């Protein structure tokens, strides 16, 4: 069994999406992507972890989509306590793992304002893990013309 955990937060942020209305708009796009993009595996549940800060509009949206089908699985919504914001998205990733660790073999963790755009991304990650026993995880990140606009080439070159 496979899952993707997306950490959701509807409170105020420093950058876009900066409020719950914008966050829901971005998340709608992410969810639509989950319904149309092939992960390359026959089963992949999408787990949305709500770091619940009491935003009714955002919480209502998550309640509405809970149980919807995706390209290869089902949307599951987990609500974790606010706890004064401790842990942020990593706290949400950990929350999901602790709650569901026995249900899934492979895990993918993603922020709510990211969108994977390449077909078969999940299958490719599993293949890397299976074929190289020295790997403990596979990290996915961007690398595009947009990134070059922000002069990130030096960062990318550092790791080459």
What is each PLM-predicted segment?
Residues 115-160:
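Conserved catalytic core of nucleotide-sugar-dependent glycosyltransferases
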């Amino acid at each position: 069994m496979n899952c993707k955990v997306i950490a959701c937060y509807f409170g105020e942020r420093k950058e876009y999406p900066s409020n719950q209305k914008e966050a829901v708009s971005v998340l709608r796009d992410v969810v639509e992507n989950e319904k149309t993009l092939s992960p390359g595996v026959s089963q992949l549940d999408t787990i949305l972890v709500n770091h619940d800060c009491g935003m009714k509009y955002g919480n209502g949206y998550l309640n509405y989509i809970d149980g919807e089908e995706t390209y290869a699985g089902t949307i599951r919504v987990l609500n974790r306590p606010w706890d004064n914001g401790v842990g942020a998205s990593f706290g949400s990733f950990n929350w999901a793992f602790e709650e569901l660790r026995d249900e899934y073999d492979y895990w993918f963790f993603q922020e709510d304002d990211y969108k994977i755009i390449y077909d078969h991304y999940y299958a490719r990650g599993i293949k890397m893990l299976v074929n190289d026993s020295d790997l403990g995880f596979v990290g996915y990140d961007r690398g595009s013309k947009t990134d070059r606009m922000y002069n990130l080439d030096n960062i990318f070159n550092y790791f080459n």
